[in-house]
Amino acid sequence: EKLEKKIDNNSAGVIITYLYSTSNHIEKFLSRFKNKITIIEDAAINFGAKSNNKYLGTLADYGFFSFNVVKNLNTLNGGAIYIKDNQLFDEYVSEKKYEKFPIINTINLLLTILILKFFFNNFVYQFFHYFLVLVYKKKINFILKKIYPILYHNYERMIPKSYSYDFNWIMNDVGVYNLKKVKTDYLDRRDKAMLYSQLISDQVATKFDCFSEDNALLEYTIVLKNTDNQKAHAKLMEEGYDIRHTWYINNHLIDGNDDKTNFKDTYFVETKIFCLPVHKNISKKDIQKISNIINTFI
């Protein structure tokens, strides 16, 4: 109802972000606002996810995806845009101008991948963890910016030049290779997410039934009931697990507006949502340990 009241002749569109939405939520929203306003789907972290057998990012007027290093389809960099209207799509393609992806940027990407692979190897991480503890304790921003780029985001006044860079052959080959693994990787993440759901007590967290392909499950998201995500992160860090403590920052704060009336949910999300890892380096034994620690947050 609040959104409907906000829509007027000056409204360009509305962006919907799939965090822990279900197919039911998605279909209700689309049926309610279709043809009332342009709908843009933020499916950045949900490539391959479906609602009623239709891919997220292709349900509304526009959709966009991210194929960055940590996404479920990794091409090292870049993403994709979906445009439903064929005429608008043809116009966009005819006007779009591409620039070659700089070689130095490609080298930097490959070096970043190698560094991440090295430091987050399970064996190396046992030693690297002590360094991370120091980074968090001393708040060494140079390192934290690499771990949590979203917390130190620079808001651009103009479209960055990199938005015009085309894929090069390395990104194409990496994308093709990873595209073949999207389904099997998803099933592995889903199994791990379901294990978290089974092991974590309802007393300490709200959990979501998001196992029906309507979420790509890059992480398993819970809402903490009795503590906040910063305290939960600190406790798990003591036990050897660096769990991402912040999912999304509250952009409302950037405007210097401390009125929480219209944005209660965003304040709640920023402090209470906790993202549990389901990547390849996390074993079932790790999940059991993490869940046992979380169950102490009573």
Model-predicted regions and their roles:
Residues 2-94, 98-101, 275:
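Active-site phosphate-binding strand-loop segment of PLP-dependent enzymes
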Residues 13-17, 28, 50, 86-298:
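PLP-dependent aminotransferase class I/II
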